[in-house]
Amino acid sequence: MHPPSITQLLIILLIIVLLFGAKKIPELAKGLGSGIKNFKKAVKEDEEDNQSEENTKSQIKQSESKNENVSKTHTDSQKQDT
């Protein structure tokens, strides 16, 4: 699919001006811009939350494996003592 031509863009712009009026267009653009900004911010925060959850899970796994190693070493040393 090819991008719209200049003529098509001008017709779309004219329809928008007729529907909303010239005074409302800056307000609509501002609202659209802030909406996009908020969406990007939410996506970034979600990615950061997911990353921190992954880091926490990996830290828990590392701690569990260390605890298992310590427990195994302790059990082995008790067996050697008897």
From Swiss-Prot:
Coarse class of the protein's main subcellular location: membrane
Topology relative to the membrane: Single-pass membrane protein
Organism domain of life: Bacteria
GO biological process annotation, one example: protein transport by the Tat complex
Start and end residues of each stretch annotated as Disordered: 42-82
Subunit relationships: The Tat system comprises two distinct complexes: a TatABC complex, containing multiple copies of TatA, TatB and TatC subunits, and a separate TatA complex, containing only TatA subunits. Substrates initially bind to the TatABC complex, which probably triggers association of the separate TatA complex to form the active translocon.
UniProt-recorded name of the protein: Sec-independent protein translocase protein TatA
Organism: Helicobacter hepaticus (strain ATCC 51449 / 3B1)
Organismal lineage: Bacteria, Pseudomonadati, Campylobacterota, Epsilonproteobacteria, Campylobacterales
Gene: tatA
